[in-house]
Amino acid sequence: MKAHKIFWLNLAAIIIISIVVSGDMFLAMKWEQIHLKDGLKKVLSTYPIKNLETLYEIDGHDNPHYENNDQDTWYIESSYSVVGSDELLKEDRMLLKVDKNTHKITGEYDTTTNDRKNATDSTYKSYPVKVVNNKIVFTKDVKDPALKQKIENNQFLIQSGDLTSILNSNDLKVTHDPTTDYYNLSGKLSNDNPNVKQLKRRYNIPKNASTKVELKGMSDLKGNNHQDQKLYFYFSSPGKDQIIYKESLTYNKISEH
């Protein structure tokens, strides 16, 4: 009888300890997420950069491994892609090079279209542009007035978005490596998020499409300056091709594509 009582007391103690430890671990993980979100808020609060020409006076994350001929250069890239089950069907891409030495912004707007049934019908076009007085200007004549207006009105989310609002979602996971300063955010966003609303309106994306977001970059999470980062929005609707919007801001190196 005594041994039986001791067994149940030990079992109860183990259960209580497990509950306490689990609770402490849950609180620790929750506190870590709050701390990381606060750090990311400092980083994202440095946006929007409404005038891209202000980047002439802004230094980024310095890296001694970058090529010397790329020093003091910002690269801004965005792309809107329609992706089938296993292939890229359509992509519009803007890439700008912000040269801090010459105070010039140049780049190109590319369009790619792949026919799902006939690969030989794929098309690629590139339109060279520059930025003058914070406005996109063509360096060669464009015949299509609709395309011309579309490109001239192009804006990046770092110019017109509300990036800190991403952190308001309750369905996010944030990780940060203090050794490398690499961070990653991923999760879901509601249709009420202002960035989601803006992208759906701009690209005529179905209003009921679900949205996943991913943010990657390098930062000490202190918000001291603009850092390299990549932002992804994934829009999905049942029976529809996936739509992906990507945007990146990098310093001293050519943006990956």
Curated annotation (Swiss-Prot):
Q: What is its main location?
A: membrane
Entry keyword set: Cell membrane, Membrane, Transmembrane, Transmembrane helix
Coiled coil (residue ranges): none
Q: Which GO terms describe its cellular component?
A: plasma membrane
| Transmembrane portions of the chain | 6-26
Q: Where in the cell is it found?
A: Cell membrane
Is-annotated flag, keyword Zinc-finger? no
Q: How does it sit in the membrane?
A: Single-pass membrane protein
Annotated signal sequence range = none
Protein name as it appears in the record? Uncharacterized protein SAOUHSC_00172
What species is given as this protein's source? Staphylococcus aureus (strain NCTC 8325 / PS 47)
Q: What is the lineage of its organism?
A: Bacteria, Bacillati, Bacillota, Bacilli, Bacillales
